[in-house]
């Protein structure tokens, strides 16, 4: 394999696989898929996937600490499929602008969750 291909494959594996080189791995469970390290649905406010917790200053923040759903291979792959279908005819900036819509992202979450429920 040529060096450029190896370097690209390394990036893909770090993002799409279980990134055991990450200092926080595993943040949810061993073998998790790290594609959605930063959840595109945050905050989803779905009580099956997370909860509001109180910070030291008394304010509340959405916690995904107990969420395993987005890190399952089937779910992570389907989320990517949904996003790619929506953005296939757009350049990167257009795609990011489209996806920077929380309501749209939550609709994606709901479609994927209907197909792959939280277990």
From Swiss-Prot:
InterPro entries given in the database record: Zf-like (IPR007212)
Lineage top rank: taxon: Archaea
Name of this protein: Uncharacterized protein MJ0836
Pfam family name, one: zf-like
Taxonomy of the source species: Archaea, Methanobacteriati, Methanobacteriota, Methanomada group, Methanococci
Organism: Methanocaldococcus jannaschii (strain ATCC 43067 / DSM 2661 / JAL-1 / JCM 10045 / NBRC 100440) (Methanococcus jannaschii)
């Amino acid at each position: 394999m040529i060096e450029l291909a190896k370097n690209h494959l390394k990036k893909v594996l770090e993002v799409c696989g279980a990134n055991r080189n990450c200092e926080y791995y595993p943040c949810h469970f061993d073998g998790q898929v790290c594609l959605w390290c930063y959840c595109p649905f945050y905050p989803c406010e779905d009580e099956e996937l997370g909860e509001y917790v109180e910070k030291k200053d008394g304010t509340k923040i959405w916690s995904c600490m107990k969420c395993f759903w987005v890190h399952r291979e089937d779910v992570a792959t389907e989320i990517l499929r949904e996003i790619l279908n929506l953005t296939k005819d757009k350049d990167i900036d257009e795609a990011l602008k489209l996806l920077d819509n929380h309501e749209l992202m939550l609709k994606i979450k709901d479609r994927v969750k209907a197909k792959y429920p939280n277990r």
